Amino acid sequence: MRFSLSPVRPHSVVVPSLPKQDVVSYISGTTSNRQCRCVLTLPSPSVSTSRPPVLPKPETWESLLLNHDQIPGEFSPTGSSIPVKLGRRWMEYQGLQNWDGLLDPLDDNLRREILRYGQFVESAYQAFDFDPSSPTYGTCRFPRSTLLERSGLPNSGYRLTKNLRATSGINLPRWIEKAPSWMATQSSWIGYVAVCQDKEEISRLGRRDVVISFRGTATCLEWLENLRATLTHLPNGPTGANLNGSNSGPMVESGFLSLYTSGVHSLRDMVREEIARLLQSYGDEPLSVTITGHSLGAAIATLAAYDIKTTFKRAPMVTVISFGGPRVGNRCFRKLLEKQGTKVLRIVNSDDVITKVPGVVLENREQDNVKMTASIMPSWIQRRVEETPWVYAEIGKELRLSSRDSPHLSSINVATCHELKTYLHLVDGFVSSTCPFRETARRVLHR
């Protein structure tokens, strides 16, 4: 590791007629391609002297700037140089207490974990063949053994165990046979399952982690599935009378459910088979399942989390970390997720319109008790409105960011606000609601 320090020697002359002034010394350091700056306030000498004040030894500066359990040059929001071990509180960081006290200000450990899982989604995008003129369009560009390494995660400590495909359930008209083949691609590679194998990483995390990563919308039929925005009942789901007194029952967006359940060997089947195999192999040790995705992948991640907790009665802790996801289901579906213990952390950009669709939401979750904005209506009308196939509910805990807070985003447009790299940039820069963007953010957007 290369470390350089360049202290600025303070002046040693003191004017007797003026009150004592503290001397401020600026120390800049560079560690692992990360720049940081510390400010040390030193008491001024009581009398004028030809010798400069005694500065702390360089190793003292290094101890202030470096910490083996923190990103170099970064301090906790409380100002403490003593890091919090991730492994000791891993369930808390996975949402056991719904991330209470970790989001505002954003805990440094949680920030790093969000960014780390975001990189798994980035790798899913990198591995997908987007070229419609390619004979391998819609497939994974890399073999399973080298996918993580070739898609930007060479030292993740994870091993890819399963490739995942999603199939559209849309019935194509006959005339589609004359259209380009890419328009009729019904089944395409959408992500993967990977398991942590590195002993040091397992020790750092405090458990063995299974990650399921989903990319966002890519194919023509996936876009069409996104437009099927009406709510539909979950297959084999509980009745609404058992959940919140509603007759509608848990419902989710039709297109998302179609992509998850369609096909002779559906995405749902693949996820279930692989999770069953991994539970058989690692079920006797601390284990977590973290499902992450962007855009369409965020919605699919939520459905997969629900399905895993429903299918496996002794399922490990299941957490969703989603980026820029659309709405997925109704209030009854949200209640079902909460009841089964599924934890969902939604990273939302206030300027991203995708997070505001589909349908409408008739509630405000800023308070502990859900408050219906339509409370002026008679209760029976409210119930009827909620049971319509267009009324959705926000699911999980929300980390709300804004493109307008970043000094690196000169303009606000729909495409930029929804991009995954914008989300990761905003997560890296966010401090708190009172300090929305830090100057030391590492992820600067390059355009």
UniProtKB/Swiss-Prot annotation:
Keyword Endoplasmic reticulum: no
Other observations noted: Directly regulated at the transcription level by the floral homeotic gene AGAMOUS.
EC code: 3.1.1.32
GO biological process, alphabetically ordered: lipid catabolic process
Residue span of the annotated presequence: 1-46
Organism: Arabidopsis thaliana (Mouse-ear cress)
Localization per record: Plastid, Chloroplast
CC per GO annotation: chloroplast
Distribution of this protein across tissues and organs: Expressed in flower buds, but not in leaves or roots. Restricted to the stamen filaments immediately before flower opening.
Role summary: Sn-1-specific phospholipase that releases free fatty acids from phospholipids. Low activity on galactolipids and triacylglycerols. Catalyzes the initial step of jasmonic acid biosynthesis. Not essential for jasmonate biosynthesis after wounding or upon pathogen infection.
Induction: Induced by wounding. Induced by methyl jasmonate.
Keywords for the protein's UniProt record, in alphabetical order: Chloroplast, Hydrolase, Lipid degradation, Lipid metabolism, Plastid, Transit peptide
Similarity comment: family membership: Belongs to the AB hydrolase superfamily. Lipase family.
Superkingdom to which the source organism belongs: Eukaryota
Broadest EC class assigned to this enzyme: hydrolase
Motif (GXSXG): 293-297
Name of the protein described by the UniProt record: Phospholipase A(1) DAD1, chloroplastic
Gene symbol of the encoding locus: DAD1
Active site location: S295 (acyl-ester intermediate), D352 (charge relay system), H418 (charge relay system)
Taxonomic placement: Eukaryota, Viridiplantae, Streptophyta, Embryophyta, Tracheophyta
Entry-linked CDD domains: Lipase_3 (cd00519)
GO MF, one example: phospholipase A1 activity
pH-activity note: Optimum pH is 6.0-6.5.
Deleted gene: phenotype: Defective in anther dehiscence and pollen maturation. Delayed flower buds opening.
Catalytic activity: a 1,2-diacyl-sn-glycero-3-phosphocholine + H2O = a 2-acyl-sn-glycero-3-phosphocholine + a fatty acid + H(+); 1-hexadecanoyl-2-(9Z,12Z-octadecadienoyl)-sn-glycero-3-phosphocholine + H2O = 2-(9Z,12Z-octadecadienoyl)-sn-glycero-3-phosphocholine + hexadecanoate + H(+)
